Amino acid sequence: MTNFFFILASNLALTSLVYTADTQLQEILNSFIQRYVFVTEEDTTQDEHSKIEDLHKKRNFLASFCKLIVYNIIPVQCGSDVFKHYVKYYNQFGDIIKHTVGKTREINKTSCAITMVNSLITLFQQLQRENHRINKQSEEYLNIKELAKRFALSFGLDAVRNREAITVLHRDGIRFAVNPIENIDDPTGPPPNILFLDIILEFTNKLLKQDKRLVLQFLDRKIHAGMPSSRGEDWQPLVSYRNTLIQGEADQPPTTSRRAYRARKKDLEEEHMDEDE
């Protein structure tokens, strides 16, 4: 079916038959799904038969929306707000979301990987808004970790075929984790999103050895080797993530003084502006 739409789109005489949803319509459709499908409130007055019918209706709504993604009517990235519910609503819609993840990966592995990391970022930011400090033992945080694990497993064992997609996922995750670099609450502390490295750590076993080296270099450029020598608990996500990237390598985690770390923050901000990687 995807090939059929591609043929239509590539034939000028048939382009009028191809419909692409604009941004406004994409937002309306997504809003409908979030409001009427992914809802936790239950009507206690409903009998069992009504509940089953209601679930069936929701599944049809979700399946129809996912078909629009799979058939390229709306961009793959629109699936991030669906992917993020994979763990929380696994019993109700897990099969539909899993199938959609698989199909989007077949269409474009890299776009699928970007959609995955965006869904993880969305959940992480939501957790940040709800909690001044994220509890790594909380159910919400563990659900994000579990979602990352399931995403990683969905790539299978062929690291060569998935190498570009996985590398892009890591780079996007690193960008988020170190941006902003400045910690308002603690000038010598880590970037406020540094804990996100614990999430993308779940994907490190999908990297080829040579790609681990490239991701490590990218990480060091972004963080500017700015890890203070004291390495408190707040820096542990960076330590753990970096250690998984240097397994089998001779490199050791970089150490710098807190003064050097503060001095380099300004340089890093300028690098973010100039670097398109």
Label the predicted regions.
Residues M1-E277:
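Long internal repeat-built scaffold domains in very large eukaryotic proteins
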